[in-house]
Amino acid sequence: AVMSHLRLSDSNISSDLVRKGTANLILGMEPMEVLRYSEFLAPDGVIITAKEPFINIPNYPEIQGIYDKVNSFKGSRLVESVALAKEAGNAREVNMVVIGAAASVLPVKAETLKAAISELFAAKGADTVAKNLKAFDLGLGK
């Protein structure tokens, strides 16, 4: 699993690390993985994660228990990322679906994020841009 910290602020930031108990958002691609880092979540923070588990260990916990734990964090969401990515035109767009779902709690306007997505994927062609934007919008609607 990969973990990254991202801090956004209008003022100077003395460290790029997020202290435990202070994260406004934990964004994840796998439900059990986000729970491993839930101690970083602020009391009013939310978890947004892809719903689909990546079961790569023989003793993976019962999935409903994981869903229940994620849902115990107020405002948190399990996103049907694979189905939405397929609806967008490419099953590999799950990350963009999850980012779209997070857009409602990020301090950045969705239109700003969409402009960045368009710029980032422009070199890959209009079809790739369109699929990523559709995946983002589908996630945003969830």
Where do the protein language model's features map onto the residues?
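Active-site cofactor/cluster-binding pocket
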Residues: A1-K142
